[in-house]
Curated annotation (Swiss-Prot):
Species whose genome carries this gene: Edwardsiella ictaluri (strain 93-146)
InterPro entries hit by this protein: UPF0181
Protein name: UPF0181 protein NT01EI_1861
Pfam families to which the protein is assigned, alphabetical: UPF0181 (PF03701)
Disulfide pattern: none
Family: Belongs to the UPF0181 family.
Transmembrane segments: none
Amino acid sequence: MVGGMPALTHEQQQQAAERIQTLMTQGMSSGEAIAQVAAEIRASHRGEQIRVAFDEADDDEASQ
């Protein structure tokens, strides 16, 4: 899978994780919370994207 992702600092990643946890404690499902925070991050980081590639074949080999 290849996708454009904003480059986040460790502090920004921590804030995102805390925001997800807050939304979940308010009754939102984990998937909904992650999607909402991802949308918020994308909206606030226009033009600061890096390309990230995930090689799923390596994951399959490591689990065997």
